Amino acid sequence: MQHVRTSGPGDEVAALDVAGVSHSYGPKRALDDVSFSIAPGTFTVLLGLNGAGKTTLFSLISHLYDTRRGSIRIFGHDVSRASGEALRRVGIVFQARTLDLDLSVHQNLSYHASLHGIGGHEARQRIAALLDTVNMQGRQHDKARSLSGGQIRRIEIARALLHRPSLLLLDEATVGLDIQSRAGILATIRKLVETEGIGVLWATHLIDEVEDGDHVVVLRQGDLVAKGKVADVVMATSANSIRDAFSKLNRIGPADMAEISS
């Protein structure tokens, strides 16, 4: 494995620390001894082909599945032992769309706020501010079903930020979106990292999105095969670009690369 630290220098507590994590579905191995960490205020891209283990890892981090081998800590809290404390610091955007399409934008967001004990004036203030953050101001009364795919994604990001998490997880957040929508969402996340100091783990199979990250973690069929700064991973694999490095790490040819490059 090509290895460069993903966390920053010093003894700062990692926003996310994944240590020796393995997971199987019956006889099928989904993850095998995966370890990496993310420093607060950094943007890490989790890159892998479909079936690499990205969604399984997200399910373990969010405690949808129990971590039976290895450990996952969020700001020092083990998610399997103190899940409530750990997960209160996390915002999650899953690949599947999860807005209630029969409700308005405001109703979707206010319901989520209520789950975190946020209501009344404070909820309205946070919703208004976040709609501005994701460039959806003035759309609070629109029905969710009237929104485009990119707009729904923006609302889901706003929802994930309502309780002011310190770590944001996004699983294939731009799948099915046009290039302009993808670029806009990535720019929004990049700005959150820089202005709010949020740690981000962005899972994708699209190589073009790697350049937006500070670091990259590469999964291949459940194995972690590279991690570090993008330039360092490229250098360690004797590649000319991250696209070339990914091709080498996954042992795939030009025809397959075309599918994951746009």
Indicate residue ranges for each PLM-predicted region.
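Conserved ABC ATPase "signature" region
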Residues: 110, 114, 121-139
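Helical segment within the ABC ATPase nucleotide-binding domain
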Residues: 183-195
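Catalytic Walker B motif of ABC-type/P-loop ATPase nucleotide-binding domains
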Residues: 168-171
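Conserved catalytic motifs of ABC-family nucleotide-binding domains
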Residues: 164
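Conserved ABC ATPase signature
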Residues: 143-147
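Conserved ABC transporter NBD signature motif
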Residues: 70-81, 86
